UniProtKB/Swiss-Prot annotation:
Molecular function via GO: glycosaminoglycan binding; type I transforming growth factor beta receptor binding; type II transforming growth factor beta receptor binding
Residues found modified as Phosphoserine: 641, 644
UniProt remark on domains: The ZP domain mediates dimerization. The N-terminal OR region is composed of two intertwined domains (OR1 and OR2) with a common, novel fold. Each contains 12 beta-strands that form a parallel beta-helix-like structure, plus a single alpha-helix. The OR1 region mediates interaction with GDF2.
Protein name in UniProt: Endoglin
Domain of life per record: Eukaryota
Residue ranges, compositional bias (Polar residues): 635-653
Swiss-Prot/TrEMBL keywords: Angiogenesis, Cell adhesion, Cell membrane, Disulfide bond, Glycoprotein, Membrane, Phosphoprotein, Signal, Transmembrane, Transmembrane helix
Quaternary organization: Homodimer; disulfide-linked. Forms a heteromeric complex with the signaling receptors for transforming growth factor-beta: TGFBR1 and/or TGFBR2. It is able to bind TGFB1 and TGFB2 with high affinity, but not TGFB3. Interacts with GDF2, forming a heterotetramer with a 2:2 stoichiometry. Interacts with ACVRL1. Can form a heteromeric complex with GDF2 and ACVRL1. Interacts with BMP10. Interacts with DYNLT4. Interacts with ARRB2.
Membrane topology summary: Single-pass type I membrane protein
Name of the gene encoding the protein in the UniProt record: ENG
Stretches for region OR1, N-terminal part: 27-44
Amino acid sequence: MDRGVLPQAIALLLAVCSFGPTAGLAEGVQCDLQPVDPKVTYTTSQVSEGCVAHVPNATVGVHILFLEFSKEVSTLELTVQMTNPNGARPQEVLLILSVNKNIHLTLQVPEIPLHLAYDSKLVFLQEAPKAVITELPPSTTKNQLFLWANTKGSIISAAELDNPQSILLRLDQAPTSPSRCTLEPRKDMGHTLEWKSHTQASVLGCHLEGVTGHKEAHILRVLPGSEAWPRTVTVEVELSCALRDPEAVLILQGPPYVSWLIDANHNVKAWTTGEYSFKIFPGSNIQGVNLPDTRQGLLEEARKLNASVIASFVELPLASVISLQDRSCGSGLQPSPTTVQITPPGEGCNQDLLLSLIQPRCSDDVMTLVLRKDLISTLGCTITSLTFWDPSCQAEDTDDKFVLRGTYSSCGMKVAENVVISNEVVVNLLSSSSPQRKQVQCINLDSLSFQLGLYLSPHFLQASNTIELGQQGFVQVSMSPSIPELMTQLDSCQLNLGPDVEMVDLIQNQEAKSSCVSLLSPSPGGDMRFSFLLRGYVVPMPTAGILSCTVALRPRTWSLDVHKTASTRLNIVSPGLPDKGLVLPAVLGITFGAFLIGALLTAALWYIHSHTRHPGKREPVVAVAAPASSESSSTNHSIGSTQSTPCSTSSMA
């Protein structure tokens, strides 16, 4: 047998054996629990307040995260998943982030039409996601935000989290959930949301008086959740023993509907409620025992198992994964003298977060960046100087912030077409002998102009402001001036037909919304192009509309997008109406039709003349009834009908 498997097999055999009570133990347990070194983290779906709804026919599914942080600056990893890509889901997803402090956000999202709403003054994105960004309304309470979210779509989930470190949000809807999302205290979000907290669990330990030996006990008590349904809790145990290999007992107590999957790198004896199994033998379920559900009772249980040390005692909310790390491993209980955390000298200044706060803005021929001193202090940093590449351009030191600014013609600025402005920011820190440098860029949108034109042919020769129902339109968006350092892409395009008609989405998240829309190759000059087919049942009546497109602008050495919108007004008419001027094909058609009618009329007159006889030689004429109206009704019925097209507009209607 493999050496790595042998200890686990021995642990499994030992776990099956019964632990009999030790004779001669005193009735009371003398144990003074104190904070100790072992580290316990956990992932849970329990939130302080939340709700989950099932809205199968929602066009826009809204998910809200109310995030409360204790520090002025925190980091957050947010992962959005779609477990079943082929399952029922809204056409669009709106994710709302409401935060009370500054956060540095790392976001991972699937390839879906996603809208993201947050306060840009508090949320700093590590890199731009493929999402449409919306600014949250200012000074919004929880109730006001709920009302605002209801105007955007159907609320699928909402949750309030305290000090989250990482969040996993699954967009798959739970069929058993109610049809309306109503916030409930101590909500179990189930499969919809799991999260891990920045705040570590409180770990306590003690010596058990009157017990000799070196056996140590790790007690994990999982508290009941708001909903009782069968679930498995994975317990990861990592014991790093440098001096010796002590005996370890793992006591797991939880609600009766919880089973355990133990993944340990060390020989442990398991003593649990419910069923449990080891990861190396996942199919071998072992029946547990009845354990007391009080702290004193669990300490007594550890003493019965001859444990002389409670190496860790933790009470946790209902979790899906619990991770226990103990590096002292029975080498003697070392209670922490105080719960105050001392920051190691090498970790005093979080330089990565500090550099992420440097976000310049360009306007009125000036690049400006502002660093708040309270954020700098929270990161443990002390700035001695802040300059551009040209050290003579130093930041202004005010009471509450550093302000660094420079005109486009000074401080070593590099300017491309008066639009893309770049420089280098140099930060000198008290804790570092070498300066920190960051390349910065911003876009002067005031110097850019965009033109959006509609054409009725793929040659893009003559722009038009009128289009017929059922006609294919070709759109070109051009930017002036054209700048090689600036990448452009159509982020979204919509056709607004007024307040009484639903918006027609053509492009979303830089992708065609349906098969009626085609993204075309750029023009030789780099102009963005696409085509769309305007179906009759998309636009219910001849009307006027506004075609608008949002362009994503990004310098080639920058990770964030800047957006600019261009629009034009369209007249939408029914086929055959004289709302459009005559173009060359129409003139040629009318000329040919007139010629054909004249030729047929001449031939008819010649035929009548050649067959006319003397009145006396004419034969009697027999009156014949007119043809039934059904012959002409079929022709009249087809007037005004439109031919169906193969493209699907299910996502546009």
